[in-house]
């Protein structure tokens, strides 16, 4: 399953959390009201539906607190802290909801008792899952063919994503390297001539091919027989890496892979629906954010002389140049020598108000107008300045391909990679942009929008 979506393990975790929260509240109701009182509330007062709503609110807050990130479960102190905060926020929101809509109330006593019950159940469950997923026998067993950079990068992607459900059992080599040579957390377990026996002894579920040169000793016949017999799944490292990490590894790419693995062509109707939806959402966003925009314009004008808005040339779809609109967040002499400069962390050109509005993304509000005009979409690769595009296209392979789709207000690269100001940062972001272009869909757009909202609410900021 692509890394853009929830992995199967994460989906099971969400479902288990839902059952635990739901069951915990029901248990609290029985503790507080007894059998007869609970059955009356559940059956005659729509208690089942009320508890379902409360459970949904809790799940959303758990998501916003990154409690479906498996790395959080490895730190029990952090896990406990986040669970307490998340459940506290969830029950505060529910209290507010019950105040305005009393018919949804499940009972104050029940609410108070359910908090510690749900907290303990979730904590024990998360610790158990962490111990279980760390067991070496749990997960699909992967044998990597190759020992070069692509092979190592593929294995490291698996080691970094414990939640993906894979285990590297070892590497096989073509050049007769010494068996049992350590490579990261695993080792060389044999050569390509031993593939047949290794599949059985290591109980391999999937072979990942991570060698570029496929002449000479490459075991084409052996792999063909295995594939046709259905003994084991066989996959290119490029596709496997993409699925695990949610990005396309540029160093592994061949033009042929981009051609044959490209996304299916959208129908004209789907394109029109997407454009209408994006423009409609942008118009709604412009209306809803109007009071914030007016207030922002006033404080910008009060703080420093100069225009309220900042217009700058950017490269759009198919290389077309357009002017992006933002609230001005830098001094008017930010580029007094006329040369474009990368934005950096703690950039001293940013004004005090500018720092605040950039942190909570308010400076991006005027870009709703760019979306309405059709120059941008809600979701897509962030538009870059022509000067930097020209520079990066010379240094980074496939860079121009990010302009095959409309630029976005937010994007896959923005939620997956921290902000950067270098060629290497641009290279890393391109890998996420290519993934988005290849896998673009409504479901992926919704995931990105949801993650962006989470980022804004927790003030992780921008540049």
Give names to the regions the model predicted.
Residues 2, 15, 22, 26, ...:
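A solvent-exposed beta-alpha-beta segment
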Residues 83-87, 138-157, 307-330, 352:
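Membrane-cytosol interface motif
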Residues 1-138, 166, 274, 463:
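Signature of alpha-helical transmembrane segments in polytopic membrane proteins
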Residues 373, 387, 394-463:
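C-terminal terminal-structure detector
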Residues 176-181, 238-251, 310-352, 410-429:
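Short, glycine-rich, amphipathic interfacial segments at transmembrane boundaries or analogous
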Residues 187, 245-284, 308-312, 342, ...:
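Glycine-rich flexible loop motifs, especially short His-Gly-Gly/GGXG/HXGH segments used as catalytic or interaction
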Residues 270-334, 370, 442, 447-463:
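A hydrophobic, helix-centered structural microdomain
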Residues 343-406, 448-456:
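A short, structured surface patch at a secondary-structure boundary
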């Amino acid at each position: 399953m692509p890394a853009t979506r929830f992995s199967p393990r994460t989906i099971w975790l969400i479902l288990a959390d839902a059952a635990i929260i739901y069951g915990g509240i029901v248990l609290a109701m029985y503790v507080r009201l007894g059998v007869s009182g609970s059955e009356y509330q559940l059956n005659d007062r729509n208690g089942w539906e009320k508890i379902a709503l409360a459970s949904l609110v809790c799940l959303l807050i758990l998501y916003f607190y990154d409690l479906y990130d498996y790395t959080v479960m490895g730190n029990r102190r952090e896990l406990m802290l986040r669970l307490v905060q998340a459940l506290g926020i969830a029950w505060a929101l529910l209290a507010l909801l019950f105040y305005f809509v009393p018919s949804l109330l499940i009972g104050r006593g029940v609410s108070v008792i359910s908090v510690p019950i749900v907290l303990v159940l979730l904590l024990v469950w998360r610790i158990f899952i962490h111990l279980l997923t760390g067991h070496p026998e749990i997960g699909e067993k992967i044998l990597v063919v190759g020992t070069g950079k692509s092979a190592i990068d593929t294995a490291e992607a698996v080691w970094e994503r414990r939640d993906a459900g894979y285990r590297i059992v070892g590497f096989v080599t073509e050049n007769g390297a010494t068996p049992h040579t350590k490579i990261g957390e695993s080792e060389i377990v044999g050569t390509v001539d031993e593939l047949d026996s290794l599949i059985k002894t290591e109980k391999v579920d999937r072979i990942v091919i991570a060698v570029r040169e496929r002449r000479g000793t490459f075991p084409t016949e052996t792999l063909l027989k295995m594939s046709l017999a259905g003994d084991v799944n066989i996959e290119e490292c490029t596709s496997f890496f993409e699925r695990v990490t949610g990005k396309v590894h540029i160093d592994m790419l061949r033009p042929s892979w981009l051609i044959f693995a490209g996304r299916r062509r959208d129908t004209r109707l789907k394109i029109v629906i997407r454009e209408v939806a994006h423009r409609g959402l942008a118009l709604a966003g412009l209306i809803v954010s109007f009071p914030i925009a007016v207030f922002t314009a006033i404080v910008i004008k009060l703080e420093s002389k100069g225009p309220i808005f900042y217009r700058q040339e950017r490269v759009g779809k198919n290389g077309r140049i357009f002017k992006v609109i933002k609230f001005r967040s830098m001094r008017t002499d930010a580029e007094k020598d006329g040369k474009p400069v990368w934005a950096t962390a703690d950039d001293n050109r940013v004004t005090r108000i500018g720092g605040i509005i950039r942190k909570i993304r308010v400076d991006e509000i005027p870009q709703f107008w760019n979306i309405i005009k059709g120059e941008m979409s809600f979701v897509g690769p962030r538009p870059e300045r022509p000067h930097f595009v020209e520079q990066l296209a010379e240094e980074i392979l496939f860079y121009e391909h990010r302009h095959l789709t409309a630029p976005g207000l937010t994007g896959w690269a923005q939620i997956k990679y921290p902000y950067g100001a270098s060629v290497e940062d641009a290279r890393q972001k391109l890998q996420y942009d290519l993934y988005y272009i290849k896998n673009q869909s409504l479901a992926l757009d919704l995931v990105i929008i949801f993650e962006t909202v989470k980022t804004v609410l927790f003030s992780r900021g921008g540049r």
